[in-house]
Amino acid sequence: MRVQRPKGTVDILPETSGQWEKVEQTARDLFKRANYHEIRTPSFENYELFSRSSGETSDVVEKEMYDFEDKGGRHIALRPEGTAGVVRAYVENKIYGPDYVKPFNVYYIAAMYRYERPQAGRQREFHQIGVESFGSNGYLADVETILLGHDLLAELGVKNYELHINTLGDSEVRQAYHDALVDYFTPVKDQLSEDSQRRLGKNPLRILDSKAEEDQQFLSEAPKIRDYLDEESKENFNKILASLDKLGVKYVIDDDLVRGLDYYTGVIFEFMVDDPTLWASPSTVLGGGRYNHLVEEFSGPETPAVGFGIGEERLMLVLSKQNPEMFEDQGIDFFITNIGEGTDIKAVEVARQLRSLGFSAQYDVDQKKLKAQFRKADRVGARYVVTLGAKELAEGKLTVKRLSDGQQFSLEFTDLEDKANLLSKIEK
């Protein structure tokens, strides 16, 4: 029987997984410095969680969700995005209570699932890095979230990225805008795509996100939400923009930006990368915004919230082109070679001692000839080769060779007891 991975999935092999680990660790370190803590939620949830949060008319729910009935007759869905599960956990575990400091800031790094056409940077199983902040409706919470996204891309070495930003206002603004869109699109309904005709009666805002060719001719003249914003929404949006100006963060106010999920309210944003070697036009690598009603939607108290998500596959595609130096194989610190009776166990002890000091170290479990061990040390990219023979074992010594310049050092076993002492002797 020939077995293959399902279409739209990828094996992340060891030569690549280290690159993912480096990106994820960079994100973890940044988020922790901002006092965000990791949250882990199930990879599958009840179907209604996503259908209610993402919107019944969204592409995610209508076309892309993996859902099924389990053996207990429950309607289950694999998570297509990270926010809904985090909100569910926030409500179910009563994190809105007084025992938790607000804003409650979390991040996640997890696999998601959408039935999409596989292409470069987009798979049916994909990975997302995200942050969510619950409990503050202040404009600085929006600014902080945007800055976290900006600073993460900067730390990773992403080039030519641009912040696109818009606001959807509150529920009253959305309703007024909804009515204006219905009035605009209804006379040309028969000329719209099938999807847009269906969405016109349910959520015409989704039409603005359409990629269908027949819809494009009507989008440029469609009403703009900025013309329907109330004074409070305008004031809040202007505070965010003024803060970004003062902080030196450039942005583009994008009237066409609506985001693909129905739960957004207030500010929304995307970071787009302009790289013609990757895409014909600028493409989104990070997106998010404010969602002040989703906690209530899941029977929690009124709770403002804001967050963003990054598709890792797309991010890795960008970094492989723009910052390949980040992924250069650093090899390992030490490879222990040995020859002679009794040296095998000592090689194991030396490797364990080096690891306890924080170094990466490997020895030859196959105990091949010394020449073969040296070849392996070179193949794994060792910075130093430790040689241990019967004579060295008897004298309590070992030889260390620095491969970058061939310099050799004679060390006592006791030199391995202290990291600073060891480094002082081999980094001369």
UniProtKB/Swiss-Prot annotation:
Please list the reactions this protein catalyses. tRNA(His) + L-histidine + ATP = L-histidyl-tRNA(His) + AMP + diphosphate + H(+)
On whether Mitochondrion is a keyword of this UniProt record, the answer is no
Is Protein biosynthesis among this UniProt entry's keywords? yes
Task: Give the principal location in a single coarse category.
Answer: cytoplasm
Question: Could you tell me which Pfam families the record lists for this protein?
Answer: HGTP_anticodon (PF03129), tRNA-synt_His (PF13393)
Lineage, top-rank taxon, reads: Bacteria
Key words, A-Z? Aminoacyl-tRNA synthetase, ATP-binding, Cytoplasm, Ligase, Nucleotide-binding, Protein biosynthesis
GO molecular-function terms, A-Z = ATP binding; catalytic activity, acting on a protein; histidine-tRNA ligase activity; transferase activity
Q: Where found? A: Cytoplasm
Instruction: Quote the EC number.
Output: 6.1.1.21
CDD domains referenced in this protein's UniProt entry, alphabetically: HisRS-like_core (cd00773), HisRS_anticodon (cd00859)
GO BP:
histidyl-tRNA aminoacylation
- Top EC class per UniProt? ligase
GO cellular component assignments: cytoplasm
**Entries under InterPro entries matching the protein:** aa-tRNA-synth_II, aa-tRNA-synth_II/BPL/LPL, Anticodon-bd, Anticodon-bd_dom_sf, His-tRNA-ligase, HisRS-like_core, HisRS/HisZ, HisRS_anticodon
Instruction: Report the HAMAP family cross-referenced here.
Output: His_tRNA_synth
What is the protein's quaternary organization?
Homodimer.
Quote the NCBIfam families the UniProt record gives. Answer: hisS
Please state which protein family the record places this protein in: Belongs to the class-II aminoacyl-tRNA synthetase family.
Q: What is this protein called?
A: Histidine--tRNA ligase
